[in-house]
């Protein structure tokens, strides 16, 4: 199979990269009707599979799970996930032939073998759904022409899909129809119904393309969403301990600090996050972020270039073929870092203290979010899509670190995201060596300033720069659509 994106002429590459339309609430007035009464069979019952299925069932759809015969016979985790939640479970041969919609929610590396196994069993005119377009775009999977191919891609880990739904909300979602597979023209209606069933319509839905989703998703998760959180966690922890700050305090400040900081980001963008600092700290965080952007920009651009060209996917698929030798080695090494092995203190840290004593973390978030956004839009990805793949998804990933540190983040995200995260981390830490040598505890571990005195002209200029960044402008109106947004409880 050939990389689908690379087979397209430049004109179509740019056209598909640029597909991005924010959908109005009125476009979801039909609810789940396009899928009502149809048999929906989910293949795979991991984090995305189980949690999407729970939401879809609660929304009124007929959901069952098709698993490999050996997974059923051996009562593996996927079988237990489905049966313990009261779902019907059967083999591919038992359930796929009568399915109207088959949702392939297995890990990326299994997609080719899974689709090759289920496609001969799918009935004429049925629909195949993905939540990530890697198999179509990067592997070039060819789907039978009578089958409609759609995507409904929640922009967060599977566990958060369920938690946001239970809170009466949802997570931002991209939907798409594969242009090579929409024989009856009902793909978009089904994709919209899918988004309603998972709750995504309450948080904002972008009509995208398989190409735009893949290229932006890979970029976001490798850089700001996972890669920089890993790099920042390790470097900030080691620096605090080196400078004499109690390791248990440092561990807690970082483990729970990302979540606290990015919750402010979620509700009011970079502006709100920066406004949580006193004026001297805000100016310092701004200047640090500018320096970090200069240092890291070539690395962000390299990741985007390798994603667009297919080089990242090619390299990762070689590791798949080698039984994930690099992925597993890097995962084990992460588990041995001092940050991962140091338990956080039990004493509480106040919400404001996470901001006051985490100026460098805030600077890293600002730099990473803006760089990811800028690099994606320079590559032809539309601003709304770049916003969701950088700023908005970040609090959801930070929440996984709050639960069980980097182990939990890397467990919950896909293997594809995890592999890209390690590539970024391994390149970023050496890049920041000289920068980190200058870091003192006044920007990580202790307050930067107890006074609030600043030069008014400098403060006005900094505030203007923060507020006028394009991600702040697009983010402001996207957040207006999230009327049901609630605080993380």
Curated annotation (Swiss-Prot):
Molecular function via GO: ketol-acid reductoisomerase activity; magnesium ion binding
Record: residues binding Mg(2+) 2: 217, 389, 393
Binding, substrate: 414
Residues where NADP(+) binds: 45-48, 68, 76, 78, 108-110, 158
Active site: 132
Gene Ontology CC entries for this record: cytosol
Pathways per UniProt: Amino-acid biosynthesis; L-isoleucine biosynthesis; L-isoleucine from 2-oxobutanoate: step 2/4; Amino-acid biosynthesis; L-valine biosynthesis; L-valine from pyruvate: step 2/4
InterPro entries given in the database record: 6-PGluconate_DH-like_C_sf, 6PGD_dom2, KARI, KARI_C, KARI_N, NAD(P)-bd_dom_sf
UniProt cofactor(s): Mg(2+)
Boundaries of every KARI C-terminal knotted domain copy: 209-344, 345-485
HAMAP family to which the protein is assigned, alphabetical: IlvC
This protein's UniProt keywords: Amino-acid biosynthesis, Branched-chain amino acid biosynthesis, Magnesium, Metal-binding, NADP, Oxidoreductase, Repeat
Residues holding Mg(2+) 1: 217, 221
Cofactor: how bound: Binds 2 magnesium ions per subunit.
EC number: 1.1.1.86
Role noted for this protein: Involved in the biosynthesis of branched-chain amino acids (BCAA). Catalyzes an alkyl-migration followed by a ketol-acid reduction of (S)-2-acetolactate (S2AL) to yield (R)-2,3-dihydroxy-isovalerate. In the isomerase reaction, S2AL is rearranged via a Mg-dependent methyl migration to produce 3-hydroxy-3-methyl-2-ketobutyrate (HMKB). In the reductase reaction, this 2-ketoacid undergoes a metal-dependent reduction by NADPH to yield (R)-2,3-dihydroxy-isovalerate.
Organism: Flavobacterium johnsoniae (strain ATCC 17061 / DSM 2064 / JCM 8514 / BCRC 14874 / CCUG 350202 / NBRC 14942 / NCIMB 11054 / UW101)
Name used for this protein in its record: Ketol-acid reductoisomerase (NADP(+))
Catalytic activity: (2R)-2,3-dihydroxy-3-methylbutanoate + NADP(+) = (2S)-2-acetolactate + NADPH + H(+); (2R,3R)-2,3-dihydroxy-3-methylpentanoate + NADP(+) = (S)-2-ethyl-2-hydroxy-3-oxobutanoate + NADPH + H(+)
Stored PROSITE patterns: KARI_C (PS51851), KARI_N (PS51850)
């Amino acid at each position: 199979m050939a990389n689908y994106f690379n087979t397209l002429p430049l004109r179509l590459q740019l056209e598909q990269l640029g597909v991005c339309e924010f959908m109005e609430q009125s476009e979801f007035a039909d609810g789940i009707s396009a899928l009502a009464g149809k048999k929906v069979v989910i293949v795979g019952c991991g984090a995305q599979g189980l949690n999407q299925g729970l939401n879809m069932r609660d929304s009124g759809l007929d959901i069952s799970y098709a698993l490999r015969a050996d997974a059923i016979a051996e009562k593996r985790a996927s079988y237990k996930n489905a049966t313990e939640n009261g779902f019907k479970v059967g083999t591919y041969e038992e359930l796929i032939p009568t399915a109207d919609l088959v949702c392939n929610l297995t890990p990326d590396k299994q997609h080719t073998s899974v689709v090759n196994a289920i496609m001969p069993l799918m009935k004429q005119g049925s629909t195949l759904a993905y939540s990530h377009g890697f198999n179509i775009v990067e592997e070039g999977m060819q789907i039978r022409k009578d089958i409609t191919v759609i995507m409904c891609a929640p922009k967060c880990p599977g566990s958060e899909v369920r938690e946001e739904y239970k809170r009466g909300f949802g997570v931002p979602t991209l939907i798409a129809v594969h242009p090579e597979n929409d024989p009856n023209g009902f793909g978009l209606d089904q994709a919209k119904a899918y988004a309603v069933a998972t709750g995504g319509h309450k948080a904002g839905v972008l009509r995208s393309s398989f190409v735009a989703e893949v290229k932006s998703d890979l970029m976001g998760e490798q850089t700001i969403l996972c890669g920089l959180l890993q790099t920042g966690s390790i470097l900030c922890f080691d620096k605090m301990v080196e400078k004499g700050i109690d390791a248990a305090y440092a561990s807690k400040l970082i483990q729970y600090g990302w979540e606290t900081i990015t919750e402010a980001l979620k509700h009011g963008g970079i502006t709100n996050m920066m406004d949580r600092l006193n004026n001297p700290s805000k100016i310092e965080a701004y200047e640090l972020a500018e320096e970090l952007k200069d240092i890291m920009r070539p690395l962000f651009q390299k990741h985007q270039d390798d994603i667009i060209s297919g080089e990242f996917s090619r390299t990762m698929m070689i590791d798949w073929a080698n039984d994930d030798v690099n992925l597993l080695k890097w995962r084990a090494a992460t588990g041995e870092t001092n940050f991962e092995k140091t338990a956080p203190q039990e004493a509480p840290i106040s919400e404001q203290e996470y901001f006051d004593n985490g100026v460098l973390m805030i600077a890293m978030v600002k730099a990473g979010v803006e760089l990811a956004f800028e690099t994606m839009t320079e590559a032809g990805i539309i601003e709304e899509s770049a916003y969701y793949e950088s700023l908005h998804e970040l609090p959801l990933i930070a929440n996984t670190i709050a639960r069980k540190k980097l182990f939990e983040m890397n467990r919950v995200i896909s293997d594809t995201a995890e592999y890209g995260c390690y590539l970024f981390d391994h390149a970023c830490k050496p890049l920041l060596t000289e920068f980190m040598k200058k870091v003192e505890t006044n920007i990580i571990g202790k307050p930067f300033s107890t006074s609030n005195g600043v030069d008014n002209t400098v403060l006005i200029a900094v505030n203007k720069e923060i507020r006028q960044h394009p991600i702040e402008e697009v983010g402001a109106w996207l957040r207006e659509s999230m009327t049901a947004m609630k605080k993380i409880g």
